């Protein structure tokens, strides 16, 4: 629970901490919990929730992309991993806001941009690593397509919804030759 003098927000969390072993083992373990208990992973911290509560806001501003600088002293694989990490730092906070159903338009746009950059990076630079990235690239392409559809759907809801709720629209359609009875 996070509280201020005038407000309270419940937080239910299970925290997974890597004390030893590989990151892959921790992720595999946490994903089993996600599936088994219908949990979802969230990158937002209790401190962020507290700051939002104090500011009387529901969501932090959308996270923007940061410039990636390649290090010529590192291997191509290490540079690609840094690039992917940068894209994920751009993507995950925006996805968290969308998943929590508190996102603003900018969160959706930035998530779509991050997905696009991540997909392009894996597609164009995937041969920089020995890891199999084809499956990731394919899944990201499908996810990216989903976001484009979501954006189109939301746009249609806003524009067509307002148009159809306007009383003059029905009147105009009755007068229109194509729709006249």
Spell out what each predicted region is:
Residues 1-181:
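Function-determining surface determinants
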């Amino acid at each position: 629970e996070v509280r201020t003098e005038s407000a309270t927000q419940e937080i239910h969390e299970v925290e997974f901490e890597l004390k030893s072993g590989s990151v892959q083992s921790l992720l595999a373990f946490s994903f089993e919990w996600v599936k088994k208990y219908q949990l979802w992973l969230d990158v937002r911290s209790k401190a962020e929730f507290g700051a939002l509560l104090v500011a009387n806001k529901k969501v932090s501003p959308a996270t923007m992309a940061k410039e990636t600088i390649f290090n010529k002293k590192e291997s191509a694989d290490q540079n690609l991993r840094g690039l992917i990490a940068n894209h994920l730092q751009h993507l995950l906070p925006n996805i968290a806001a969308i998943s929590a159903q508190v996102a603003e338009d900018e969160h959706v746009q930035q998530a779509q941009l991050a997905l696009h950059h991540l997909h392009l990076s894996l597609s164009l630079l995937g041969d920089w690593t020995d890891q199999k990235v084809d499956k990731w690239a394919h899944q990201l392409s499908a996810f990216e397509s989903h976001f484009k559809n979501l954006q189109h759907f939301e746009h249609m809801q806003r524009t067509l919804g307002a148009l159809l709720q306007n009383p003059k629209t029905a009147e105009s359609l009755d007068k229109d030759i194509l729709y006249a009875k």
